[in-house]
Amino acid sequence: MHVVILGSAAGGGVPQWNCRCSICSLAWAGDPRVKARTQSSIAVSPDGERWLLLNASPDIRQQIQANPQMHPREGLRHSPIHAVLLTNGDVDHVAGLLTLREGQPFTLYATPGILASVSDNRVFDVMAADVVKRQTIALDETFEPVPGLSVTLFSVPGKVPLWLEDASMEIGAETETTVGTMIEAGGKRLAYIPGCARVTEDLKARVAGVDALLFDGTVLEDDDMIRAGVGTKTGWRMGHIQINGETGSIASFADVALGRRVLIHINNTNPILIEDSPERAGVEARGWTVAHDGLTLDL
């Protein structure tokens, strides 16, 4: 199984377009310790030829250009991307669908709830129904979006997208609006979970023994954005678990047998983005890799 992390940042990327927090300021200045990162997306293939895109980042055209595996290869129009799968309806995961409208056939997969959030917004009708097939997938149903690639969706604690929030919103609920993905090919297993509000015992049992876990690394501490002075929301309020602490992701998975442990969907205020920082050293010392754009895994 071949995995390419196309975009390793959370919504807005690094640096964010209007941000001068300490981390974005380093990126704007060209400091090599802070790599520029695009918004959350990965691609997975069983053979290096046919690819499944997981989440369609607003930066998808840039990501395709930066990764030769994603380039058109034959004829006047072609794409190695045969299918797209959404893990939630967040803007940084669906806006890129608007770029994928140029008459290229593929199938769009998501749970009924996630797909409804797309279908209810007429702007996505630019993906012509006779070109882009939309396929609903039930939780815990195994399907094959690309030949040789088996995928199963499962609920994880999360919340509805910001643009769908209302008075009834519940943070940490396990519904079909935020899902994790188990991907299998050639006897290897990859768990992809870019958004998760907390780690449950059921989640730990589900991912135990995977060859690689790509997991929500949005915030190091729950109050990252508040500390940086750029916002008032905690990680929890945004539906994202913190990395550090007794209930954080690293501690929660410490007793779980895993292969590669990779942090993805990293917010611009997260100090692990600074390569020589004590925060980066701390997560690496505990066995985790901080993802960057273009990182590849061959499982």
Swiss-Prot record:
Single GO BP term: pyrroloquinoline quinone biosynthetic process
Pfam family, one: Lactamase_B_2
Disulfide bond sites: none
Coiled coil: none
Top-level taxonomic group: Bacteria
Purpose of the protein: May be involved in the transport of PQQ or its precursor to the periplasm.
NCBIfam families to which the protein is assigned, alphabetical: PQQ_syn_pqqB
Family: Belongs to the PqqB family.
Protein name: Coenzyme PQQ synthesis protein B
